[in-house]
Amino acid sequence: MLEQLQTLKSEAETQINEASDLKTLNDLRVKYLGKKGPMTEIMKQMGKLSAEERPKMGSLANEVRTALTEAISSKQQILETEAINEKLKSETIDVTLPGTAPSIGTKHLLTQVIEEMEDMFIGMGYEIAEGPEVELDYYNFEALNLPKDHPARDMQDSFYITENTLLRTQTSPVQARTMEKHDFSKGPIKVICPGKVYRRDNDDATHSHQFTQIEGLVVGENITFADLKGTLTVLAKTMFGEEREIRLRPSFFPFTEPSVEMDISCFKCGGKGCRVCKGTGWIEILGSGMVHPNVLEMSGIDSTRYSGFAFGLGPERVAMLKYAVDDIRHLYTNDLRFTKQFQSTETGEI
């Protein structure tokens, strides 16, 4: 048995040292130290030895098993290190190659247009006022001189949530809320109200069930129609160019009296007539007027002392006109082929 153990140890160590990969090494471990290996067979034969030989052979067998286990462990470390080095060698990264740039996002076209208008009005002393998109019927209609059963309500087919709440059809409710809580001892009201609005329109190239509005409101003492015209002139020239002329046409809105719609001279043809202005030389931009006395009184404002004007326009329309967008749906479909055409200079990583 002594000779058998010595031969086994010598043969196993030779093969372990010659192992060139981890799979071969593991096969050798199973071959020599596994349940069916020669070491196990030798240990089973210990019972056949005499009482004098058994301790000596048992100790020697344990030494051989320990030696082979250590040899396998040592060889495994060597092979694992070689495998890692080989992998690193084959997967070397050339740090001098150009890197992959992170995706850069820019402000959406609508955001750019809205912020451009906000900046203009803030520069004129206006504040930004916001309100809930889920609105009370009272603020969306009644406080704006649109009592129940008023025919003008049909012009704004609405998404009702309950009998008295709906998705707002305009940002005018923010104006009503602002007037209710304003303290005129601190000065006049000068606010713009940007936000999303909702109407039951069928989506097409020029209509959407959800869109944005920016409405403006000024209320104070001695506010006149001339103030409204001056404000609209600044708006037209800022958004569409200094050479723009404006034209005010009589119109009707329940919450203003008198009411007018503003047209601007066509920026495409200079007023000569083209496809953009439909041959008229003018492009309709927004509705406006002097705040109706009933609206002031509904908000607790003395209409004999205070007056004001209001206006409202859609950033989508402004964007479509300025940038020749032929379908409002392009603004909402998130097609990067479209949105990347209007990258702003203000960027941020996505």
Curated annotation (Swiss-Prot):
UniProt entry keywords in alphabetical sequence: Aminoacyl-tRNA synthetase, ATP-binding, Cytoplasm, Ligase, Magnesium, Metal-binding, Nucleotide-binding, Protein biosynthesis
Protein name as annotated: Phenylalanine--tRNA ligase alpha subunit
Alphabetical list of InterPro entries matching this protein: aa-tRNA-synth_II (IPR006195), aa-tRNA-synth_II/BPL/LPL (IPR045864), Phe-tRNA-synth_IIc_asu (IPR004529), Phe-tRNA_ligase_II_N (IPR004188), Phe_tRNA_ligase_alpha1_bac (IPR022911), Phenylalanyl-tRNA_Synthase (IPR002319), tRNA-bd_arm (IPR010978)
Family: Belongs to the class-II aminoacyl-tRNA synthetase family. Phe-tRNA synthetase alpha subunit type 1 subfamily.
Enzyme class, spelled out: ligase
Cofactor note: Binds 2 magnesium ions per tetramer.
GO cellular component terms, semicolon-separated: cytoplasm
CDD domains: PheRS_alpha_core
Native species: Listeria monocytogenes serovar 1/2a (strain ATCC BAA-679 / EGD-e)
Binding-site positions, Mg(2+): E257
Enzyme Commission number(s): 6.1.1.20
